[in-house]
Amino acid sequence: MSKEKCSLTGGKEKRGELVRSLAWQHLVKQEEEEAVKKEEKEEGEDEEEEGSDSSSDDPNPEPPCMHPDLLELVVDREKCRKIRRQYRQLIYTVQQNREDIVNTASDTLSEALEEANVLFDGVSRTREAALDAQFLVLASDLGKEKAKQLNTDMNFFNPIAFCDLLLLFVGFNWVEEECKEFSDCDDSIVLSFWGMLHEEATSWMLQAETFHFIFGSFKAERSARKPRLGCHKRACKMEGSGDMPTKLRRLDVHANQETTEKEVERILGLLQTYFQKYPDTPVSYFEFVIDPNSFSRTVENIFYVSFIIRDGFARIRLDQDRLPILEPTNVSQVDDESDSYSYCRKQGVISLSLQDWKNIVSTFEISEAMIKNSY
């Protein structure tokens, strides 16, 4: 009765674990499908916006004369959209065939990885790289599950069986000799066993030759190294002339922080001066941060302006042409730190390549930087 009860409880526990694992797999698969649908929806909205911008009332519109750099950007955007679509399709296909990939010995996972490697050659932006990382996480999980199901079928070493085979090999049988251990046997039988084993083993082993010293053994004591006179003369010469190398000082992190704060305050003063001079006119974000003569200085300006936006001294939004602009904020809202809902904050990432910087300078016709160098 107790055995039946234990078997019933064990079966219930196994069924419970199976139900929990299936529920967890269903939730994970549902979350992945929702993420893919959300990304496809955002992609469709982007395509609809571009389609509405390109449409016009003229039934036979003439092709607009676009700048070659802008035309290259449009082609690059279409290429990136195609890569994202292929990544999503690849992820969806692997998720649908998850059980077949794990339970069978097919090369579907390897083919999917090769396809992802081909797609990764055309990746140049963050969104495509994020999809590639998502696929790699999925592929690594599938590879881990396949590795767990491997069956090596290795034969473990059995010492008892080995002893029986060894005794049969040398021609010794326990049944014929009527003894169970070597202590019960005669000394002649034991010596003959080890003698035959020795003869067989020596034929499979190579003996290393002895080492003969040609000039005798090495000396135990190491000879003292003679000092080099050249280094001593050079050191005396440096001490006499007084030209000593500069010592490396410890890096001061606070000094770098103070430099950053001073630069942010200087750029904030320039921005506030512009707002006081033109209170009703927002300033273009690109015209404010872009330095037409230095790409590195442009990146530094974007970095410093981000602190101004974070602290609430200015805000950034899109105008009618979907271009970013800078506007002043209400000072009373910034000073009131107790009210956390006084203004809404959003966080974003700006990616700017060297080619994008050149295109912005030529498109906006920026000839002079609004933020002058302080050095």
UniProtKB/Swiss-Prot annotation:
Localization of this protein: Nucleus; Cytoplasm; Chromosome, Telomere
Chain coiled-coil ranges: 23-51
Annotated region described as Disordered, given as residue ranges: 30-68
Keywords: Chromosome, Coiled coil, Cytoplasm, DNA damage, DNA recombination, DNA repair, Nucleus, Repressor, Telomere, Transcription, Transcription regulation
Keyword Transcription regulation: yes
InterPro entries: Nse4/EID, Nse4_C, Nse4_Nse3-bd
One GO CC term on file: nucleoplasm
Swiss-Prot/TrEMBL GO biological process terms: DNA recombination; DNA repair
TM ranges: none
Segments of skewed composition (Acidic residues): 42-60
Function noted in UniProt: Tissue-specific component of the SMC5-SMC6 complex, a complex involved in repair of DNA double-strand breaks by homologous recombination. The complex may promote sister chromatid homologous recombination by recruiting the SMC1-SMC3 cohesin complex to double-strand breaks. The complex is required for telomere maintenance via recombination and mediates sumoylation of shelterin complex (telosome) components.
Family the entry assigns: Belongs to the NSE4 family.
Complex and partners: Component of the SMC5-SMC6 complex which consists at least of SMC5, SMC6, NSMCE2, NSMCE1, NSMCE4A or EID3 and NSMCE3; EID3 seems to be a testis-specific subunit. NSMCE1, NSMCE4A or EID3 and NSMCE3 probably form a subcomplex that bridges the head domains of the SMC5:SMC6 heterodimer. Homodimer, and heterodimer with EID2. Interacts with the C-terminal region of CREBBP.
Official protein name in the record: EP300-interacting inhibitor of differentiation 3
Lineage: Eukaryota, Metazoa, Chordata, Craniata, Vertebrata
